[in-house]
Design a protein with these regions (language model features):
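PAPS-dependent sulfotransferase catalytic core
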Residues: 1-167, 228-259, 314-362
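Alpha-helical hinge/cap motifs
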Residues: 109-110, 211-212, 322-327
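Alpha-helix-centered segments that form part of catalytic cores
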Residues: 79, 84-89, 165-178, 250-276
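Short beta->alpha connector loops
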Residues: 186-191, 296, 323-330
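A structural signal for short, well-ordered beta-strand segments and their strand-loop junctions
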Residues: 101-104, 124-128, 182-185, 205-210, ...
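PAPS-dependent sulfation machinery
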Residues: 115-199, 233, 242-255, 351, ...
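PAPS-dependent sulfotransferase catalytic domain
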Residues: 5-8, 15, 189-315
Length: 362
């Protein structure tokens, strides 16, 4: 008995960011002006809306080129491989590319590390597109099932599109120690650790960035325009939207979330996110470096990559750190037992949480 299942691009449409990437490729539009690596800017970027709005027209332009047609076909081919467990198709990618993933909660120094990783390899980070280097793609997160959305399928499809972009963007690069190196800021890697571990390859390198939750929270609300006047949680930017999403996923009622103190909501998000590091399969990969937020520690990590890629006199950009440890002393008291719980959970899977360094409060 044979059953034939047909899915079209109506059920599985191509992602707008993939279309935007391919448009640059097929029309030889240079990638330039990328701002994902800016340490100091607190501006919330809105380029995503433009990409979505322009996607229908841009898709026509991409499909008018054979190269664009081939890339979209390749992405669907890889999606089928992921859906059906075609291990050999994925193994070919694993044997060619070596992924270095920078993983951590937002505002933990991951953008700096990713940018300097690219610089250590000779790239101008402003010419590396956001979809290649930074957060958001491939997609992963708390499970969603609603009209037109199955987040597990979304993870598979965006992974297929990401791998297609990796082949296009990095495929002709010179290998280092036998493989082509692909740096990626993978904020969402904790939500599906086993998935990223198995698909990107068991030899993948992970760099985990960790920061004190009070400092992370301050940086988050500053990104969104400041602490709300009433001190209550509010959604004004992407990070706060992820806080809302994650808390609702684990049982917080939306009405109750609006009444929560800003730091209480953020602290719960911080705790959950760092639990995922230990509980979703990410820890199965033992090529993990853990770096606690601090100027010297961050710069030392980057210098090691400059040495590794042949620069004997590395001059990485300085990592900017601002001392705000005099703010919110009551928050520090609330955070201490949470930090210790995370440390204990990490220990259950053999990960050493940098407790002493985190308690410095940076």
């Amino acid at each position: 008995m044979g059953v034939e299942i047909k899915l079209t691009d109506n059920q599985l449409p191509v992602s707008p960011v993939f279309i935007d990437f391919l448009l640059h490729i097929v029309e030889d539009i240079p990638f330039e002006g990328a701002q994902w690596g800016d340490q100091l800017s607190e501006v919330m970027l809105s380029d995503q809306r433009r990409i979505v709005d322009e996607a229908p027209e841009n898709a026509k332009r991409v499909l008018s080129h054979k190269k664009g047609q081939a890339a979209i076909g390749r992405a669907y081919q890889l999606l089928l491989a992921l859906l059906t467990g075609d291990v050999d198709a994925i193994k070919d990618i694993q044997l060619k590319f070596h992924f270095i993933n920078v993983i951590g909660i937002p505002r933990n120094g991951g953008s700096y590390l990713t940018k300097e990783l690219y610089r250590s390899m000779g790239y101008d980070p402003t010419r590396v597109p956001n979809v290649i280097a930074h957060d958001g793609f491939p997609d992963a997160g708390p499970f969603r099932f609603e009209k037109g959305v199955n987040s597990w399928v979304s993870s598979l499809q965006t992974m297929a599109e990401y791998l297609t972009m990796v082949e296009i963007y990095f495929g002709k690069n010179k290998p280092h120690s036998g493989k082509i190196v692909v740096p990626k800021k993978l904020l969402k890697g904790t939500y599906a650790g086993g998935f990223f571990h198995r698909i990107l390859g068991q030899a993948v390198e992970n760099i985990l960035t960790v920061r004190h939750p009070v400092a992370s929270c301050i940086s988050t609300y500053e990104k969104s325009g400041g602490l709300p006047e009433d001190g209550k949680f509010a959604v004004r930017g992407n990070i706060e939207d992820w806080v809302r999403r994650d808390l609702i996923y684990t049982g917080v009622e939306p009405d109750d979330l609006e009444k929560m103190d800003y730091f209480d909501a953020y602290l719960r998000y911080w705790e959950q996110y760092n639990y995922y590091v230990a509980t979703t399969g990410l820890s199965a990969n033992r090529a993990i470096s853990i770096v606690a937020y601090d100027k010297q520690r961050m710069e030392n990590v980057i210098k090691s990559f400059y040495y590794r890629f042949g620069n004997i006199n590395p001059e990485p950009e300085q990592f900017e750190v601002f001392d705000k440890r005099d703010r919110h002393p009551d928050w520090f008291e609330k955070a201490e037992p949470v930090i210790k719980r995370v440390s204990e959970v990490w220990a259950t899977v053999g990960l050493e949480f940098p407790l002493e360094e985190i308690m410095e409060g940076w």
